[in-house]
A protein has these predicted regions:
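Residue-level signature of catalytic and energy-coupling elements of molecular machines
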Residues: 1, 61, 106, 188
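Translation machinery proteins
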Residues: 2-59
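Flexible, glycine/charged-enriched surface loops at secondary-structure junctions
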Residues: 12-16, 173-185
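Flexible glycine-/small-residue-rich
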Residues: 20-22, 53, 91-92, 149-151, ...
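N-terminal charge/polar-biased segments
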Residues: 181-202
Length: 202
């Protein structure tokens, strides 16, 4: 981790990312890994959270730190394809209204999902967790999971703690049907920096 922070070639505070190759087959439903983890030190990014919920939830959402809060008027923003947020939280009863925007939100990873905690009856809690550093991760078609675990300025210790929290979460998602090796390789990179292979133990 220290090596990653020291080899960053850029002048700005680069992001540090972890890339884990898994021994899963993402085409199998029970091996399509998708979950969330609360990083103890956050990601270092200012996350903009939008809330689509009944007006009765708006005050609590605002108090929790939501940046954009809307009822029906929020849909007009989506009609214009204005996506000025990083995470979208919605209540279960409002999810059907987002169905027609699946093609807009889905490919960008913005569609609320119960697995990621963004379809929630407790909107304020979902907003607080998102702001505090709760992030979603999922395996891609190549069976690799990518996650930003902070900034170079965090230092090796905090980055390692974030990485360990992620690995613990990832290990808890190991499919019971998997017979072979679960975590095949781990690499750490910074923005524009080299990929550094690390031992699974970090």
């Amino acid at each position: 981790m220290k090596l990653a922070t020291e080899t960053s070639p850029v002048k700005f505070d680069a992001s540090v990312e972890i890339h884990i190759r898994l021994g899963v087959d993402p085409r199998q439903a029970d091996q399509n890994i998708r979950s969330t983890v609360a990083l103890p030190h956050g990601t270092g990014k200012d996350v903009r959270v939008a809330v689509f919920a009944p007006e009765s939830e708006h005050a609590a959402a605002k108090k929790a730190g939501a940046d954009i809060i809307g009822d029906e008027e929020f849909l007009s923003q989506l009609d214009k394809e204005e996506l000025n947020f990083d995470i979208l939280v919605a209540t279960p009863q409002y999810m059907p209204k987002l169905g027609k925007y699946a093609r807009l939100l889905g490919p960008r990873g913005l569609m609320p999902n119960p697995k990621s905690g963004t379809v929630a009856t407790d909107v304020a809690k979902a907003v607080s967790e998102a702001k505090a550093g709760k992030v979603e991760y999922r395996v891609d078609k190549q069976a690799i999971v990518h996650l930003s675990i902070g900034k170079v300025s965090f230092g090796a210790e905090k980055l390692s703690e974030n990485a360990r929290a992620f690995l613990t979460s990832l290990n808890s998602q190991k499919p019971s049907s998997l017979k072979g090796v679960y975590v095949k390789s781990v690499a750490i990179t910074t923005t524009m920096g080299p990929g550094i292979k690390v031992e699974n133990s970090l």
